[in-house]
């Protein structure tokens, strides 16, 4: 416990020069995409000489909707920003790419795609529960490998717009789960090597070698994910019971994974006391409820950076609106002085 109250902003993260991986997650419908876009924009504006990549790992992609432009499975620059790119992982397309790459390379690729080289393993892969998370994890592995080899565009920091909590936890469990599976599988792989190679669809594929290669990559990612200087998780919630409950569960799980988590974004706050023009009883009642849970958040997470974001009447879409809204991550929102800006966002001005 520290005697210093953490700043009610993400300024330290936005200006961080060490973080390589930033995960943004929480319960469905709490504003994860808007928050991840806002973090990515603010980091790109604060550090114009660095390159940032925003990846959506949510099967229901929203980055294209948020920026009002189409993104796909390949990283593409956000129109109007020279150092921010976006991509949306499509599980079915990614799986096809993996199989095509493995077959074309004849096994000369990363460990996981090598194991999927045609045959029965490839047929089974598409129906495996959690394949979306596995393919997202593969993108991380691919990114690390490219950075090490100097291939493709270099990104200093990758921000993940994650799926709802359950999917995200499965994704973050993958390094530990894969390590355990590979350890157990490796114990018998020596005796079953030829059989495994045949099962993979190509007797020339060294399954045991691919497994060891995969294990090394997974351990490297796990080490980075548990380094607080390299990786952090930003929780997003709204000031309601179910969201607060799920946020606490998420934080406890992250702590059990040894992942750094010290920031919470609370979205959709009414700040009704400052709305002098409209005396809305329903708004006042809801704000009273929000304040109750806000006080619990402040008490439970007194050593966290807690950022309180206002509710806008309309959706926050397009780069310019996202820029305006995201500034409240850097400078605490003041309903007395910043209310006009929120009104402009509501009107789409």
UniProtKB/Swiss-Prot annotation:
Chain positions recorded as Zn(2+) binding sites: 280, 283
Pfam family, one: ArsA_ATPase
Xref: Gene3D superfamilies: P-loop containing nucleotide triphosphate hydrolases
Swiss-Prot/TrEMBL keywords: ATP-binding, Cytoplasm, Endoplasmic reticulum, Golgi apparatus, Hydrolase, Metal-binding, Nucleotide-binding, Transport, Zinc
GO cellular component, one term: GET complex
Primary location class: cytoplasm
Active-site positions on this chain: 58
EC number: 3.6.-.-
Segments crossing the lipid bilayer: none
GO BP: any one term: tail-anchored membrane protein insertion into ER membrane
Enzyme class at the top of the EC tree: hydrolase
Positions with a binding annotation for ATP: 27-34, 240, 267
GO MF assignments: ATP binding; ATP hydrolysis activity; guanyl-nucleotide exchange factor activity; identical protein binding; metal ion binding; protein folding chaperone; unfolded protein binding
Location in the cell: Cytoplasm; Endoplasmic reticulum; Golgi apparatus
Task of the protein: ATPase required for the post-translational delivery of tail-anchored (TA) proteins to the endoplasmic reticulum. Recognizes and selectively binds the transmembrane domain of TA proteins in the cytosol. This complex then targets to the endoplasmic reticulum by membrane-bound receptors GET1 and GET2, where the tail-anchored protein is released for insertion. This process is regulated by ATP binding and hydrolysis. ATP binding drives the homodimer towards the closed dimer state, facilitating recognition of newly synthesized TA membrane proteins. ATP hydrolysis is required for insertion.
PANTHER family assigned to the protein according to its UniProt record, in alphabetical order: ARSENICAL PUMP-DRIVING ATPASE ARSENITE-TRANSLOCATING ATPASE, ATPASE GET3
Family to which this protein belongs: Belongs to the arsA ATPase family.
Subunit: Homodimer. Component of the Golgi to ER traffic (GET) complex, which is composed of GET1, GET2 and GET3. Within the complex, GET1 and GET2 form a heterotetramer which is stabilized by phosphatidylinositol binding and which binds to the GET3 homodimer. Interacts with the chloride channel protein GEF1.
Name of the protein described by the UniProt record: ATPase GET3
Source organism of this protein record: Eremothecium gossypii (strain ATCC 10895 / CBS 109.51 / FGSC 9923 / NRRL Y-1056) (Yeast)
């Amino acid at each position: 416990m520290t005697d210093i109250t953490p700043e009610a902003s993400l300024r330290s993260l936005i200006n961080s020069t060490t973080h390589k991986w930033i995960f943004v997650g929480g319960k469905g419908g709490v504003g994860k995409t808007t928050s991840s876009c806002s973090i990515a924009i603010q980091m790109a504006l604060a550090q114009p000489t660095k390159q940032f990549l925003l990846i959506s790992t949510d099967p229901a992609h929203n980055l294209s909707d948020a920026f009002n432009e189409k993104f796909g499975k390949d990283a593409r620059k956000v129109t109007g920003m020279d150092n921010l790119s976006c991509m949306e992982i499509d599980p079915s397309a990614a799986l096809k790419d993996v199989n095509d790459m493995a077959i074309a390379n004849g096994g000369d690729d990363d460990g996981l795609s090598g194991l999927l080289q045609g045959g029965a393993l490839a047929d089974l892969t598409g129906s495996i529960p959690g394949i979306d998370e596995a393919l997202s994890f593969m993108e991380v592995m691919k990114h690390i490998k490219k950075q090490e080899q100097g291939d493709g565009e270099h990104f200093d920091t990758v921000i993940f717009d994650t799926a709802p909590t359950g999917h995200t936890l499965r994704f973050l469990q993958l390094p530990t789960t894969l390590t355990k599976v590979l350890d157990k599988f490796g114990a018998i792989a020596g005796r079953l090597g030829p059989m495994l190679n045949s099962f993979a669809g190509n007797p020339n594929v060294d399954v045991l070698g691919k497994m060891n290669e995969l294990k090394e990559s997974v351990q490297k990612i796990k080490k980075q994910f548990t380094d607080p200087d390299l990786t952090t998780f930003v929780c997003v919630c709204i000031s309601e019971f179910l969201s607060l409950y799920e946020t606490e569960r998420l934080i406890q799980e992250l702590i059990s994974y040894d992942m750094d988590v010290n920031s919470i974004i609370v979205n959709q706050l009414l700040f009704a006391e400052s709305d002098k023009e409209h005396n809305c009883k329903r708004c006042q009642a809801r704000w009273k409820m929000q304040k109750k849970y806000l006080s619990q958040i402040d008490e439970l997470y007194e050593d966290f950076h807690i950022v309180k974001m206002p509710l806008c009447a309309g959706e926050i879409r397009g780069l310019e609106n996202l820029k305006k809204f995201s500034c409240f991550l850097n400078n605490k929102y003041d309903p007395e002085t910043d209310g006009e800006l929120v009104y402009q966002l509501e009107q789409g001005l």
